[in-house]
């Protein structure tokens, strides 16, 4: 009898053990849903006591993808180019896009005293991106190609320097960088704190000023094993997207409080307002823009010799279930 009771107790304990959901994100306002949701505990409330959420912050996309490969995270907010690179490297086994998160929110910022007025002035300059192969890195290299510029490693004279966003600001202030292609709020910080100006708002390069800068992706294994958890997370993601869009002043205040926790100080209000003016939260993954950025990454040599087949990259089934339940238009 004692043995039976012990076995039963173990079974009950096993049933009560919470599912752990490890979520990646960046301390950027282009990851607004993660910042607001983490600050107010909305994901934890929606998922309930049966799910334990663990948050993991990254500087740029490739690091988040490596964590996904290493089974260190289950789901992450991340840019389109690392998403595609991860899908390609894993032969479609490690990545599924389940929603969009943000559109816009990236700019090419130049130092006011760097002598840059047009594209040809970038010859011989030092230009930073957050990380080799990340979304802004690919965008810069593609723009350079379109304007007759080449990086040093490809026989040109533009020095492209992959360096973290905080270090970009430091080097800007020291006059050791001429420009940077950066996501928000770092682009706005380079303007307001680093003596820079926006040379190019990336939205101007895209149809209808719409391009995906942040996706929500998941491990296919976690999606298969825990579809209920993923759907609940998506429902909250959609609700946060709608709330942020309709309550921008309050949302910016919450994001700033969370950014203070992440980066040790809040953003000045003018920086936050400027940064938010160049982006839009959305749960639409804007698939067409990802396909174009994939072509750009392929052209820049980040995806090998064979262009990847992305037919299995998206799984919007649960997102569209949530949208139908909310009587909202499904996305494609």
What are these regions (language model features)?
Residues 1-20, 328-332:
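Short, low-complexity disordered leader/linker segments with a strong preference
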Residues 16-162, 174, 178-184, 199:
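Short, glycine-/small- and polar/acidic-enriched structural segments
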Residues 30, 39, 64, 79-82, ...:
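Stable alpha-helical elements in mature extracytoplasmic
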Residues 41-51, 204-207, 276-285:
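Short, solvent-exposed loop/beta-turn-alpha elements that line the ligand-binding surface or hinge
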Residues 91, 114, 154-157, 161, ...:
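Pocket-lining segment of extracytoplasmic ligand-binding domains
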Residues 224-305:
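Secondary-structure end/capping motifs
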Residues 295-332:
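Conserved C-terminal helix/tail region of periplasmic/extracytoplasmic solute-binding proteins
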């Amino acid at each position: 009898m004692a043995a039976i009771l012990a076995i039963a107790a173990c079974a009950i304990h096993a049933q009560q053990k919470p599912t752990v959901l490890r979520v990646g994100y960046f301390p950027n306002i282009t990851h607004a849903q993660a910042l607001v949701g983490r600050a107010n505990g909305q994901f934890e409330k929606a998922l309930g006591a049966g799910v334990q959420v663990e948050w993991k912050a990254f500087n740029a996309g490739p690091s988040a993808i490596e964590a996904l490969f290493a089974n260190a995270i289950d789901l992450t907010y991340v840019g389109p180019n690392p998403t595609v690179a991860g899908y390609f490297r894993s032969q479609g086994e490690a990545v599924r896009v389940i929603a969009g998160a943000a559109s816009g929110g990236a700019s090419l910022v130049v130092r006011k005293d760097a002598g840059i007025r047009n594209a040809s002035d970038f010859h011989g300059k030092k230009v930073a991106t957050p990380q080799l192969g990340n979304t802004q890195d690919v965008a810069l290299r593609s723009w350079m190609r379109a304007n007759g510029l080449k990086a040093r490693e490809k026989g040109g004279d533009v020095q492209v320097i992959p360096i973290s966003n905080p270090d970009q600001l430091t080097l800007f202030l020291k006059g050791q960088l001429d420009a940077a292609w950066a996501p928000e709020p770092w682009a706005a910080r380079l303007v307001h704190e680093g003596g820079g100006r926006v040379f190019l708002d990336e939205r101007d390069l895209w149809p209808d000023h719409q391009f995906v800068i942040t996706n929500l992706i998941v491990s296919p294994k976690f999606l298969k094993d825990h579809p209920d958890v993923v759907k609940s997370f998506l429902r909250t993601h959609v609700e946060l997207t709608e709330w942020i869009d309709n309550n921008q002043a309050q949302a910016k205040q919450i994001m700033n409080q969370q950014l203070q926790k992440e980066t040790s100080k809040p953003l000045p209000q003018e920086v936050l307002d400027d940064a938010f003016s160049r982006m839009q939260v959305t749960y639409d993954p804007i698939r067409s823009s990802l396909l174009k950025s994939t072509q750009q990454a392929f052209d820049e040599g980040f995806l090998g010799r064979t262009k990847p087949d992305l037919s299995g990259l998206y799984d919007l089934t649960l997102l569209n279930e949530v949208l139908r339940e909310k009587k909202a238009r499904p996305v494609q």
